[in-house]
Amino acid sequence: MILFGSTGSIGVNALKLAALKNIPISALACGDNIALLNEQIARFKPQFVAIKDSKNKHLVKHDRVFIGQEGLEQILTECQDRLLLNAIVGFAGLKSTLKAKELGKNIALANKESLVVAGSFLKGAKFLPIDSEHVALKFLLEGKKNIAKLYITASGGAFYKYKIKDLNQVSVKDALKHPNWNMGAKITIDSATMANKLFEIIEAYHLYDFKESDALIEPRSLVHAMCEFKNGASTAYFSKADMKLAISDAIFEKQDTPILEAVDFSKMPALKFHKISTKKYPIFKLKNAFLKEPNLGVIINAANEVGVYNFLENKSGFLDIAQCIFKALDHFGAPKISSIEEVFEYDFKTREYLRS
C-alpha cells in the first residue's frame, strides 16, 4: 500500500490496521510531522518517503525522500503497488487522485474533496471510499434495485446542543470538541458547520450515481446510512463510531477480521433522527443547488478552506466560514468547467478573491 497523509488521523489508523494484517507499506508521505514519520519509517520500512517541504529533508531518516506534489507523483509512477490510500487533507489531495487514476491504481479515498471539486473528471477511477457513510451505502446498495432515496447521517458536530445566538462567541477549542469522532482539525470544523455532510452527499452522488439523497442528524452516530425503497421498505447500517471500520473495508481484501465490538441492540439507547436546520447550519442550504450543478464544488470547497483556516488561525469567527462561501458564490456563480485545468483555475481565483 502507498499511504499519503500517514501522520494524520486516517493515516495513523490505517497503519494500525496494516500491521494487523501484515500489509506491506511501500511508501509514506506526510506534511510536517517528521518525528512521527520517522517512527513510521522505522516500523514499516517503506521503499519511498515524501514530505511537503525540502527544508525538513535532512531530518527524515530515509535514503529516498521526495518533496512536494512532484515527489508524490514520482512515487506513484515508480511504485508498483496497486493501492493508494489518499488521506491528504483538502484540495491539496486532488493531483494525487488524478495521477493514481491515470496510472490505473485502486484509490482508497479519504480525500473527499477530490470528488467534490472534480468528480466529473474522475469517472472510471477505481474508488474504495473511506467514509463511514459511503461504506454504509455500499453495503446497503449491493445488488439492490428500486431505490427511492438514500440518507446519510450527521452527528450535528461540536455545536449540536448550542443555541444559534451562541455561535457568535464560540472558540476554536470549542469547535474541535467533536462529540463522537476523533478526527483531524479541518474535518472536525467541517462537521460543526455541516460542510462535511454537504460534501458527503456530493461524494455519494459521484460514487453511486444517485441524486435522490439527503442527510439527517442522528446524534449518537450509531446509524450511518439508510436506504429507502420504492415499495416503502427501508434498510439501515449500524456500527459504532470508529473510522477503522471504513478504512479496513477499503484496504482489506476480506471483511472477516473483528474490527469493532458490534452494536448491542438490547442495550442501545433510543435513537432519534432530526432534520438539519438551515438556520443553524446555513451551508446545508446549498444541497439541492449543488446536486443540480456539481461545478459549484470548486467554488464552495475553496471558499470553505479559506474560511476554515482563517477560523483555525483566529483571523475570523465561526459564522464567517459560511459567509465566506456565500460571498464567493455570489461573485462567481456556477462556473462553466470543461477541463480539469479550469478546476485549478477556479480554485486559485476563489482563494485570491477572498484574500483581496
Curated annotation (Swiss-Prot):
Recorded catalytic reaction(s): these are: 2-C-methyl-D-erythritol 4-phosphate + NADP(+) = 1-deoxy-D-xylulose 5-phosphate + NADPH + H(+)
Kindly list the cofactors needed: Mg(2+); Mn(2+)
Which superkingdom does the taxonomy of this entry point to?
Answer: Bacteria
Metabolic or biological pathway, per its Swiss-Prot or TrEMBL entry = Isoprenoid biosynthesis; isopentenyl diphosphate biosynthesis via DXP pathway; isopentenyl diphosphate from 1-deoxy-D-xylulose 5-phosphate: step 1/6
Question: In the record, what terms sit under GO molecular function?
Answer: 1-deoxy-D-xylulose-5-phosphate reductoisomerase activity; manganese ion binding; NADPH binding
The record's Pfam families line, in alphabetical order, gives: DXP_redisom_C (PF08436), DXP_reductoisom (PF02670), DXPR_C (PF13288)
Give residues annotated as binding Mn(2+).
131, 133, 200
Q: What is this protein for, i.e. what is its function?
A: Catalyzes the NADPH-dependent rearrangement and reduction of 1-deoxy-D-xylulose-5-phosphate (DXP) to 2-C-methyl-D-erythritol 4-phosphate (MEP).
PANTHER family, per database record: 1-DEOXY-D-XYLULOSE 5-PHOSPHATE REDUCTOISOMERASE, 1-DEOXY-D-XYLULOSE 5-PHOSPHATE REDUCTOISOMERASE, CHLOROPLASTIC
Write the protein's name. 1-deoxy-D-xylulose 5-phosphate reductoisomerase
Report which gene this protein is encoded by. dxr
